[in-house]
């Protein structure tokens, strides 16, 4: 009886906080924009995002999903795994088989690392502290192919590659930091195996794909991969429509004449106003020359698909440059909505209590990724400027 009373009290308290938060949020927007304009802007922004951003992202998901499945079917993933394996131990302090997880999450999404972790033969290569850090390692490459292809579609090619290198640096920081946190909390995990040592008899099974022609294997791989891409595309719809809509309303301003008319992509410019107060921090760390750009990393904390939905608006306003694309690629890949997936991922492998440590480590990793990408892009620009006079002198 006492427990029920406590539970009902906590529910009442959380209900009050929820009502207060909703009233403050919509009250502030309605007070600045006007309630009819606010409602029209919410609906029109979400509708435009669905038609012009979500469907575009879904098409990329379908194509990249098909390519990824073809790579798996014809051994390209296995080849990449063999190539990357020697780098795992010295750089990430992880067994060589972990490289397969990097490739799989890069081609799909964060949870792909968990499907591998559930495989006991895969997990048998790890000590417990290494096994737990897999969530951070895999998340840093989540949806990497989608992010890079999307950025390249905006007309930038060198910047996404620099961002990929930055994401790798952030991954090293996040993974190593998580391992330190785990060992500090549970020193015994340094020697304990992730799963008990068991001798597994490998059964030689006649592979079905050897009985099929190359054309059928290619067709099946493309269709299955495309179907998985549709699933990813559908999964990002709530994040893009809900998170991006409200982030845009706190990022963009009124119409050109300074009034609100209920059109899409209007807002109160609260985030840029706050970012302006500490703009020197964002400019030095990330090279952001416009305070509106801070909306991308904030959104990427919860959903990278929603963060990508902000890019077309930034481009149309002229806020984007190569440096921003490099930083967005790095932080978008590294964070890739980890706040919405980390808890479930750690819970699925049985270490829910370590979620706060994993989140802290990965937050730091994302910052390292962004800062690294910014300074690498600055170095890239300086090298281009140095080489241009030399090239002109050679021509003359």
Regions found by a protein language model. Name each.
Residues 1-11, 181-227:
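Intrinsically disordered, low-complexity non-transmembrane regions of multi-pass membrane transporters
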Residues 26-73, 145-163:
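Long, highly hydrophobic alpha-helical transmembrane signal-anchor segments
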Residues 35, 64, 69-81, 214-306:
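Transmembrane helical segments that form the transport core of multi-pass membrane transport proteins
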Residues 67-100, 118-123, 282:
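Membrane-embedded helical hairpins/re-entrant loop segments and their flanking transmembrane helices
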């Amino acid at each position: 009886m006492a427990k029920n009373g406590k539970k009902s009290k906590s529910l009442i308290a959380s209900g009050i906080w929820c009502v207060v938060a909703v009233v403050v949020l919509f009250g502030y927007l309605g007070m600045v924009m006007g309630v009819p304009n606010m409602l029209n802007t919410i609906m029109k922004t979400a509708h435009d995002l669905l038609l012009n951003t979500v469907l575009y992202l879904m098409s990329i998901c379908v194509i990249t999903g098909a390519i990824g499945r073809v790579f798996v079917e014809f051994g390209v993933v296995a080849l990449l795994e063999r190539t990357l394996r020697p780098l795992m131990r010295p750089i990430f302090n992880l067994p060589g088989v972990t490289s397969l997880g990097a490739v799989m999450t890069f081609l799909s999404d964060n949870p792909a690392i968990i499907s591998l972790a559930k495989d006991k033969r895969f997990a048998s290569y790890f000590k417990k502290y290494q096994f737990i850090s897999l969530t951070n390692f895999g998340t840093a490459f989540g949806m990497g192919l989608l992010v890079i292809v999307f950025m390249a579609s905006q007309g930038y090619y060198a910047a996404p590659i620099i961002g990929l290198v930055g994401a790798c640096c952030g991954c090293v920081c996040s993974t190593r930091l998580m391992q330190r946190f785990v060992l500090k909390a549970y020193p015994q995990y340094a020697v304990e195996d992730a799963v008990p040592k068991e001798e597994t008899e490998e059964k030689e099974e006649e592979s079905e794909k050897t009985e099929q022609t190359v054309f059928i294997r290619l067709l099946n791989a493309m269709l299955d991969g495309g179907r998985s891409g549709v699933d990813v595309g559908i999964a990002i719809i709530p994040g893009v429509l809900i998170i991006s809509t409200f982030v845009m309303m706190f990022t963009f301003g009124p119409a050109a004449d300074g009034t609100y008319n209920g059109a899409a992509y209007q807002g109160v410019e609260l985030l840029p106003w706050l970012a302006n107060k500490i703009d020197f921090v964002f400019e030095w760390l990330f090279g952001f020359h416009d305070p509106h750009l801070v909306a991308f990393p904030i959104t990427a904390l919860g959903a990278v698909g929603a963060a990508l939905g902000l890019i077309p608006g930034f481009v149309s306003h002229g806020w984007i440059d190569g440096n921003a694309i490099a930083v967005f690629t790095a932080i978008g890949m590294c964070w890739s909505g980890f706040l919405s997936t980390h808890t479930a991922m750690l819970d699925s492998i049985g270490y829910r209590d370590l979620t706060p440590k994993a989140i802290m480590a990965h937050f730091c990793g994302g910052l390292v990724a962004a800062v690294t990408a910014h300074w690498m892009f600055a170095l890239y620009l300086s090298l281009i400027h140095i080489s241009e006079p030399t090239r002109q002198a050679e021509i003359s």
